[in-house]
Amino acid sequence: MEISNAMLLVAIVTGYWLWFKRISRWLKGPRVWPLLGSLPGLIEQRDRMHEWITENLRACGGTYQTCIFAVPFLAKKQGLVTVTCDPKNLEHMLKTRFDNYPKGPTWQSVFHDLLGQGIFNSDGDTWLFQRKTAALEFTTRTLRQAMGRWVNRGIKLRFCPILATAQDNAEPVDLQDLILRLTFDNICGLAFGKDTRTCAPGLPENGFASAFDRATEASLQRFIIPKFMWKLKKWLGLGLEVSLSRSLGEIDEYLAAVINTRKQELMSQQESGTHQRHDDLLSRFMMKKTESYSDTFLQHVALNFILAGRDTSSVALSWFFWLITMHPTVEDKIVREICSVLIETRGTDDVASWTEEPLGFDEIDRLVYLKAAISETLRLYPSVPEDSKHVENDDVLPDGTFVPAGSSVTYSIYAAGRMKSTWGEDCLEFNPERWISPIDGKFINHDQYRFVAFNAGPRICLGKDLAYLQMKTIAAAVLLRHRLTVVPGHKVEQKMSLTLFMKNGLLVNLYKRDLQGIIKSLVVKKSDGVSNGQCNGVIGEGVAVYLNTGVAVV
């Protein structure tokens, strides 16, 4: 009997070894270990995950396949992960075969408690209905105007005074935390018309904001542990699952009160025949005459919108300001562009008044080089560095890679912006000029499957234009007033999360910007090369010509 058991064990081990050797030959990418698959590599490289994935993709021509656990019957299905950054593969997944690559059950189960069947956590008809409904709102000028009001108010009354105080007291500030607070207030105001006041002197805590942060952190932890484990912890009430449950209760209570109050306000106005403007997203959904939405649906609309709009803009701006501190030439071009626009729109009689009000819509729209610098930041440091899809049915990607049903595909947005085959030999350099047309100085909208920072295809970010509006307004407000330097000894590194936060924040010192010196360097040229007209943006080596005033940045 013992001999039979021993022979059976030898047969199993031999069979597994032969299977493992065969599967190892066709898997490309990181080393795969017996049973453990690529998990040891993931653990070893966890502090530089995105760079590690990028290195593997470069070595494998833009696509590789690996298995998290090298177990028969799983390694080619649930355990198989295809990783790609090939633009043709991305277009295939995100557009051509969109229905074959949904969010999938893993993503939905992880975020269901927080986001329910909201637009960022749903597929199929549920997603399509919400997408169409939201798209109608995002195309309205009203929402853009509302965003502008919230952003400008936050900048003028809170954000800039906090920076000014820090400058006067020679105190460093964590710019990432401060911008995160500002964008949270802005997005909550736009989502449901409430001022959360997290970006205020003293940096006060807000119950809803704290609960939202805890709930997001607990939900993200579910990604890094097996499903059965977090399900068990939830059932037993252990660890962060306890925090998640309590935080969700606080969120539900807060939003229920907001929704109930808004319903009463709208009903009272309807009965009295009065009209008070409510241009937040929640009110616009509630005022639709053709639909009647449940409180749960409205709550999920607000939460999904906040999750999508808060972290992404703040993270992008943090990396933008860090890059600016290391590229003074780019900083100089941005400040000169801002000043050139303000010379035309506000004049030079009272330059000190330039900082009394944030830039308006028309002024922001003319900041072409600033938009290029922000886009270049997003290319190198996308707010969401990796995303994944579930494979519904067997398929073959354009590069010939077979992806079986039940497996998953991770597309690396981080790597997509760092490939020589897509962006050229200087792909790792911070070069805003790659976004500026050398012919007419206009902004170049690169193909969405090469530049995937705002996703692509049917799921492309609805709030892209609002995000640019907010980021450009905040960036212009800071750079017009201050010169930034990173605090000596402060280490800037990536935090391994679904969102590309800075692990230690961004500690900076602030110094007053000398606008008079910059304005003096802007020379009025009335030569044959300058004729009457409108601002023609940034031309060539950072030369911005404003044709109707004859002002050129030199």
Curated annotation (Swiss-Prot):
PANTHER family: CYTOCHROME P450. Its EC number is 1.14.14.1. This is Cytochrome P450 86A4. Expressed in stems, flowers and siliques. Its main location: membrane. It comes from Arabidopsis thaliana (Mouse-ear cress). The chain crosses the membrane at residues 6-23. Heme binds at residue 461. It is a single-pass membrane protein. CDD domains: CYP86A. PROSITE patterns: CYTOCHROME_P450. Keywords: Heme, Iron, Membrane, Metal-binding, Monooxygenase, Oxidoreductase, Phosphoprotein, Transmembrane, Transmembrane helix. Induction: By abscisic acid (ABA), auxin, the etylene precursor ACC and cold treatment. Down-regulated by wounding and in etiolated seedlings. Pfam families: p450. Disruption phenotype: No visible phenotype under normal growth conditions, but mutant plants have reduced content of the flower polyesters 16-hydroxypalmitate, 10,16-dihydroxypalmitate and 1,16-hexadecanedioate. GO terms for cellular component: membrane. Its cofactor is heme. Gene3D superfamilies: Cytochrome P450. One of its GO terms (molecular function) is oxidoreductase activity, acting on paired donors, with incorporation or reduction of molecular oxygen, reduced flavin or flavoprotein as one donor, and incorporation of one atom of oxygen. It catalyses: an organic molecule + reduced [NADPH--hemoprotein reductase] + O2 = an alcohol + oxidized [NADPH--hemoprotein reductase] + H2O + H(+). InterPro entries: Cyt_P450, Cyt_P450_CS, Cyt_P450_E_grp-I, Cyt_P450_sf.
